[in-house]
Amino acid sequence: MGKQFLIKDEVSFNQPQRPMILGTSVSTGNRHAPTHCGSLFTMTLVRLPDPERARRWCAEQRADGRSVGFVPTMGALHEGHLALVRRAVAENDVVCVSIFVNPLQFNDPKDLARYPRDFDADAAQLERVGCEMVFSGTLQQFFPKVKQADQIVTRDPGPCAEGLEGASRPGHFGGVATICERLFRVVGPGRAYFGEKDFQQSLVVKQLARELGFPEIVVCPTVREPSGLAYSSRNVLLTDAERQQATCLSKALFALRRAWHNGKRDAIELRTVMLHELEHGGVQVEYAELRDPHAWTVESPTGPMLRAQALVAARVGKVRLIDNLRLDRDDDVGAQ
């Protein structure tokens, strides 16, 4: 028997109104900034509980000549997500965000059940950074003809899904590609924004966009806490001691970048540096690998590298974390 997940509504949609002191608005392109002129006006984030209403809202924006930026998420928003939204706000007339905990990309039902959810808190954060619309839905609303996840034929995610995360989480990238296609068709964005923290996923999504002919995929740098730990929705599941222990992932990656800048180029030697740092941190390493970011391969590289992406997955207690770092450039946001 395949995976079976009960389909149910997981969020309630309250529509709080936020009073603002406004007069007329000042046009900044097709985006409008309020001015402070003394009259009371109400501005709210549009919250839509299903993909069909979201589709109509986005179609109206495009019909009015507005560019639509899109940030797909599974909720439990943190500074990494908000950085994507801010980038989208800066580059588009309107921005929408999806919040959908996608059962298709979970191998373990317990992991799905454990995934943090707080729609109202997420919506409040989105409103503060200038998002115009947020929507969600159930699996059955996205796939009306099915009642459980294992009835859905998932999309082939392509060769970039092979190895590493694809090997550790069979079916994960098929689930990602399948829901991203649905979300793209709902929103019809000109640009969609993803974080480099999920590096292999970004390759899969770029391939999907090439096959669909849209949207432009904008991959933004990983955002880190002051400790160097990459922001992740799963970080809230860590104890204080585990949170400190988890910093060994980023420490290993930045040690590797220093080795690269000091002239080390051999793939095997670089991987040895990374493994040494991770073993010193005491985490349970699932993989610690290098890949050419421009030419994905299932096999680990050997010999000298011209450019390199270091990728790691490890368990800290019961929490599985991933991280990665481009070695031949310096553009992560946060502590190094």
Language model features with spans:
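Nucleotidyltransferase catalytic core that binds NTPs
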Residues: S39-V283, R291, A295, K318, ...
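Short, basic/aromatic-enriched C-terminal tail that caps enzymatic domains
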Residues: V298-E299, A308-Q336
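Extreme N-terminal basic, low-complexity initiation segments
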Residues: M1-D9, Q15
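Catalytic, metal-anchored helix/loop core of enzyme active sites in primary metabolism
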Residues: A288
